[in-house]
Amino acid sequence: MQKLKFYLNHEASGGILIIIATILALICQNMILTDFYNHFLRIESGIIFGEYKIIKPIILWVNDGLMAVFFFFIGLEVKKEILIGELSSPKKVALPVIGGIGGVVIPALLFLAVNFGDEFARRGWAITTVSDTAFAVGILLLLGSKVPSSLKIFLLLLAIIDDICAVVIVAFFYTSELSNFAIFMAGIGILIFLVLNILKVNKISFFIAAGSFLWVSFLESGIHSTIAGIVASFFIPLKPIKGYCMLDDVKHKLEGFITYLIMPIFAFVNAGIALNSDAFSNLLHPVSIGIILGLLIGKPFGVFIFSYVAIKFKLCSLPTGSNFKQFLGLGFLTGIGASMSLFIDSIAFMDSDQFAYADKLAILIASFLAAFIGWRILKTSGNKNENFETIKEAETTNSTAEKIEDIDENKN
């Protein structure tokens, strides 16, 4: 339980930093720092190795580079959970998987229904299928004991399923024209990882070199470079070699870096939306409507309805000490797309300003409303199970007291 509390607090702190970074980006874009902010995002830098060079603006170094590290971290979590964690038990994973599927299918269908006639707009169908776990966890912590621990654990498991879906979506649906040579080089990179595992190498530097080579190969291949992070993570050894567990060590070292640096930086460079008349007038564009409907209705009710049906058909059970009203509130928290939706938006529309930033504005509006509604439902859920753990503890104490009284009576 202490480990869970630490993780939740860690995630919540990251959520606060993302909020601050988002507010700073909005201030920079809409006040006297507009020119500086836009110039900063487009400053080019790169890596030159002989005749080969990679030159990119800062915003793309963040979206293609730092986010690859983020997905690498996600991959480490997924690998550990699948092999020895909560996802290794079919019984425990059933409800998050079913809820996660609903949280992807329903919002995607809603978005496509609104944007069916526009081929370019349809590229954004996945924007509403992801969640920002840091924000959601932050809301849960604000509610304290009103939300049972079992529901918090469910949210974290659902977040892992959500991340897996995001990886699959990016890998299969957001690839540009493929380069056979670069894909071949990526294959060599994977082969290097295999050799490192076969030889049981436990030096991080070798894996960093192999990962960098793999990232460059993916970058040039047409497959989004963040997938290189996921692929590399699957080759980080979980089994200790000479008493050293590389996966745990790397995951521990990256945790703070991801939470306190990468995600806030990502929010800062991507959330700078021009809050002008064009952005607000374009909120009636089908893309904006699809995003709002997907995050505010599709995501929450997708998670809730799929889970509700599974529970009613006894395929799985409701998290201990919770009820369906709380579960609906949790569903709304999954509608907080925020940074993850902004990420999918950036690769779906290739940072195009065709919608005058109304797409990004819709993400922020829908995320805020989903957070408020979810918080409100959970806050007012006042149910019999609200203090489940306290009641259970009290019952145990009373039972113990009764046993002591019985012993005393027998002595007398």
Swiss-Prot record:
One of its GO terms (biological process) is regulation of pH. The chain crosses the membrane at residues 14-34, 58-78, 93-113, 124-144, 153-173, 181-201, 204-224, 254-274, 291-311, 327-347, 355-375. It is found in: Cell inner membrane. One of its GO terms (cellular component) is plasma membrane. One of its GO terms (molecular function) is sodium:proton antiporter activity. It catalyses: Na(+)(in) + 2 H(+)(out) = Na(+)(out) + 2 H(+)(in). Coiled coil: none annotated. It is a multi-pass membrane protein. InterPro entries: Na/H_antiporter_dom_sf, NhaA. The keyword Zinc does not apply. Keywords: Antiport, Cell inner membrane, Cell membrane, Ion transport, Membrane, Sodium, Sodium transport, Transmembrane, Transmembrane helix, Transport. Gene3D superfamilies: Na+/H+ antiporter like domain. It holds the Pfam family Na_H_antiport_1. The keyword Cytoplasm does not apply. Belongs to the NhaA Na(+)/H(+) (TC 2.A.33) antiporter family. NCBIfam families: NhaA, PRK09561.1. Na(+)/H(+) antiporter that extrudes sodium in exchange for external protons. This is Na(+)/H(+) antiporter NhaA 2. It comes from Campylobacter hominis (strain ATCC BAA-381 / DSM 21671 / CCUG 45161 / LMG 19568 / NCTC 13146 / CH001A).
